[in-house]
């Protein structure tokens, strides 16, 4: 798996994950965060490997569509690049991502 793509999709999951169904989010977390293979997820969920592959590709497209429309990841990266104080940066990102 491409490391840059993996990091990008992981970022998008952190931002837009709550907009996915519970099942979509669970599969994406297993694949991207738990590093399970398509086959391992398919066995665990009692579905075909192709069903998992198709779902992951569909959700990746959904996440990219969200980012193309809302540009939240792009804006977050701009904020990260402008702020030098690491504690302040962390506090701002927590507020942006968690709404606190």
Segments and roles (model prediction):
Residues 41-42, 52:
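Hydrophobic positions on the alpha-helical face of helix-turn-helix-like DNA-binding modules
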Residues 70-93:
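Intrinsically disordered, low-complexity basic tails/linkers immediately adjacent to helix-turn-helix/homeobox/MYB/SANT
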Residues 48-49:
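Helix-turn-helix DNA-binding motif, specifically the short coil turn and the N-cap/start of the second
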Residues 22-34:
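Short amphipathic alpha helix immediately N-terminal
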Residues 60-67:
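C-terminal flanking helix
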Residues 4-17:
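Short, Lys/Arg-enriched N-terminal segment that forms or immediately precedes the first helix
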Residues 27, 37-39, 45:
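Helix-turn-helix DNA-binding elements, focusing on the entry/boundary residues of the two helices
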Residues 55-58:
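Residues within the DNA-recognition helix of helix-turn-helix
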């Amino acid at each position: 798996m491409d490391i840059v793509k993996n990091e990008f999709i992981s970022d998008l999951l952190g931002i837009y994950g709550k907009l996915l169904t519970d099942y979509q989010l669970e599969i994406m977390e297993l694949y991207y965060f738990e590093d399970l293979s398509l086959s391992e997820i398919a066995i665990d969920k009692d579905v075909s490997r192709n069903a998992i592959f198709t779902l992951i590709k569909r959700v990746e497209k959904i996440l990219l569509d969200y980012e193309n429309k809302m540009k939240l990841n792009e804006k977050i990266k701009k904020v990260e690049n402008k702020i030098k104080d690491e504690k302040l940066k962390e506090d701002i990102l927590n507020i942006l991502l968690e709404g606190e």
